[in-house]
Amino acid sequence: MHCDETVVQVLKEKDKAPQTKSYMWLYRTGNDDKPSIILYDYQPSRNGNHAVEFLKGFKGYFHSDGYSGYNKLSDMIRCGCWAHLRRKFIEAIPSKSSQDASLTLAEIGRNYCDQLFHIEDSLKNLTSEERYSKRLELEKPVLEAFWCWIDSITALKGSALGKALVYANNQRPYMENYLLDGRCSISNNAAENAIRPFTVGRKNWLFADTPKGASASAAVYSIVETAKGNGLNVYTYLQYLLMYMPDTQWQSKPELLEDLMPWSPDVKEECKQ
């Protein structure tokens, strides 16, 4: 499971000024060869209890950035995001002359992250069991060296490098959990990529008028992005739903919706790209 959230402005939110922030939360499955499920959920705040409520009953691993609200998901195993940590080190790399070949501490931190991503790229075609074994063999030593290096350095509090070190140490309990299962990812990029269509769209439509409109937007984005994630032609899939769903007694028999899901064999045959 991958989680992320982004800001959305809702003009007519009860007891809130129009310019205040509301949030669109995103939850999606991992890249483990199972059907892709990408769900958006509108909520009036960034309180981590929204994630707790949405994921009630889920057991397993979840990937997220360093937002503390996800700490409330205490019944699951949290996997940290090495892409976020790498970004922190990149932001801390100072400008220097092209003649200066010496590595800064921030560059060393970035290079550790790059080593891990390079190894991950070489493992992408393995089974989850093979990936699990290879990670322990190839990545565990890099991780041990990285944390020894982290413990050996200091930086000014509040500096860019200082912030990178604080992030690393705060996220340390979660940063190696992806090693526990070969199906887990080294980063939360899957969620960031899935939420990007919403953030791009937001630049055009700017806001939702009402909470009902924001929830409707969440439903539409969920349908469209899940269809895309399963390799369907979105226009054809929407036509398919509008044609067959009205004749389905899904209100009384919700199990009938399974035949309309993007991973249904009939749907994949009719609506494939």
Language model features by range: what are they?
Residues 1-273:
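Catalytic center-proximal scaffold of phosphoryl-transfer enzymes
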